[in-house]
């Protein structure tokens, strides 16, 4: 490769559980009020990026986004499984601050049971072990999210995980 202009970010993915195929740039917007908006979705879709609408749109405002759109991922909490199972977009997901609980793994299983054809994203986790656990529970995509706060337990796990380099030196 002689120039960074030759880099191709677009990829085609076939998902483990849903068996669906998706082509685009595998980057999801944050589901924050200022980012997950209908206006932002119009722009991100032009570049084949995935929009995660802000959570308040799941409660009231799903109709503001294109129905059946393949570049939308509706994230909700464990209490939103019934609502998520009724959406017709490309991706649905469970988004919690700390994905390291049995309750969360069980919620992913429940969502998979309710929506066997859906491409499901789940997170937030940061370790390989929990990523594997969520995939085995039915997640097609595992979300790694590290919060900005000092009490973010995901960042605590990241900072305390031994790096491969450290274990090689022992």
Outline where the language-model segments fall.
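N-terminal capping/small domains of soluble enzymes
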Residues: 1-71
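Short beta-strand/loop segments at the ligand-binding rim of alpha/beta enzyme cores
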Residues: 27, 67-74, 114-123
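Glycine-rich beta-to-alpha transition loops that act as phosphate-gripper elements at the mouths
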Residues: 31-36, 74-79, 121-130
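Surface-exposed amphipathic alpha-helices with a cationic face
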Residues: 45, 63-66, 85, 105-115, ...
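Glycine-rich phosphate-binding active-site loops on the catalytic face of alpha/beta enzymes
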Residues: 55-58, 96, 144-155
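Active-site beta->alpha loop and helix N-cap motifs at the rims of alpha/beta catalytic domains
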Residues: 68-83, 89-93, 98
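Catalytic cores of alpha/beta
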Residues: 83-84, 127-138
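Conserved small/polar residues in nucleotide/adenosyl-binding loops
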Residues: 159-164
